[in-house]
């Protein structure tokens, strides 16, 4: 064991690295598990730790949380896999069908986003299915077996019944693992707004919040995350019944872009019909000024989601950054994933920020 330990650290070149690594190894119990590795596996791992700081950081952070709770969500939070990994957030995938073939909503790995939206533009049919109770049970149990509690945040109940599947799995597993805790939170959000919510929860967890404290905070503040959307292509809003066929046809001819938001029940509500893309871009940023914490002095993060309309998303981001000089970093632009995108279609831009409590 001592020889293996020395091999593991032969690439570390200074005392600070060694001290930090030893503390993390002891805290994660990895030190006592070296017998499960052979020499070549340890050498391979150390090579990665030495050459790739990001991999080293990700692995050590994961090991540091070995005995803590799992922070989890669904793929419909529409962040990248790199983002989920860097924030130590686990996720489970929704499903969708494209022209009758089933895929996982796996963050664009099976079908890249550009190909997905091009297929929709060319007339492909898409439909989605939520995570079922059996899938949740298997997913949750993989953590419970390791002695970890779980805080799972679901896609809004206003647009999906996935929380019901999660609750069924929770009740089943609590009987099997009475010593463990599973908390389920309805985000009342979607897409990267849901993702921005998860990012804040990860911040609080990393700042020392307990499982119970994080659950309480999530329940108290989920309606402070604002979701505003517009679309320049009404096709899928007509298909989804959010806009009537007659109104959609006339709106398309007149260049009308509907402006919607998510209300206090997590449902999408049409708020305004705005003619021309230029005006709706200005209008959505006006909504941020109206509802964001401290108005133009807003100093939180801002995310944007877009479905095959990066130019429109970039125009919104540029206007936000010009109007809100105290933002916490640049506006982050993410792709609307394949599950959410099956309903929005191409041409949707969504703006997310923290603000006053959402109303009906």
Mark where each language-model region is.
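Mixed-charge interfacial surface used for oligomerization/domain docking
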Residues: 65-68, 76-84, 89-95, 162, ...
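Hydrophobic alpha-helical signal peptides and transmembrane signal-/tail-anchor segments
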Residues: 1-37
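Intrinsically disordered, low-complexity cationic segments
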Residues: 8, 28, 32-34, 49-50, ...
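N-terminal glycine-rich anion-binding loop in soluble enzyme alpha/beta folds
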Residues: 70-135
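Short beta-strand/turn micro-motifs composed of small residues
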Residues: 73, 154, 306
